Amino acid sequence: MDAELRYHTLLEAARHVYEGHAELTDFVPFPKDVRRQPIVPQAHPCSALFQNDDALKSVAYPDLQQAIVGAAPVAHWRETYKDTDIGADFLTRFGCYCIIGEGGPYLSSDIRLYMVYMPAHFYYPWHHHPAEEIYLVVSGSALFKKGMCADEVLLPGQTSFHKSNQPHAMATQEEPVLCLVAWRDQFETPPVWTPQMDVADGTRDAAYAEGVR
């Protein structure tokens, strides 16, 4: 399958799932101004890990998972946190690429759409950003944490909404997680760590104690 077909298959699979999910369309409708843009694929150590993770078995959205995996070899994998002190383990095992937006094969003025992958026993520390955000679990599960809210474990089909600059974090346990993630408004500012939340919450130490690396 050539790259163009992989991108098209990914877009249509994402569109189908997105438009069929009320919480996503309420967040922001799937854009009508989607247009193709040039993309330079960028490899990432996490790509092979993601493509070979047999624990990802989406019953809810098998076509979307297959399309996300299928586009992985020709995606521009993001390195959002490469200039931070997060460490090599996080940088090599956290996976994200854009579907609609900067670095993605498609562009829109209304939305940014990403895939996010985390292997089993993985911790994504507290962070925040001006853009409002919604996560949809495609396959697997994860513990979602956000400021001033109770923790919750989300399964395929469930969502987590993050307000502008609301700190949030994630952790996987016995299984990985694959998510479709949408942003609206204030796309220009990337996420930054919220280290004081890790200290106050004790999440990092607790996660490590439970076997989350």
Segments (PLM) and residue ranges:
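Short, conserved beta-strand element in jelly-roll/cupin
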Residues: 110, 115-121, 128-144
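Active-site scaffold segments
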Residues: 135, 159-162, 178-181
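Short acidic-glycine-tyrosine-enriched beta hairpin
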Residues: 148-167
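Double-stranded beta-helix
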Residues: 7-8, 173-213
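Surface loops and adjacent helix of pleckstrin homology
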Residues: 129, 147-149, 173, 182
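A short, N-terminal "cap"/entry segment at the start of jelly-roll beta-barrel domains
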Residues: 2-109, 207-210
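Short beta-turn/strand-loop junction motif enriched in small, turn-promoting residues
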Residues: 102-104, 122-123, 166-168
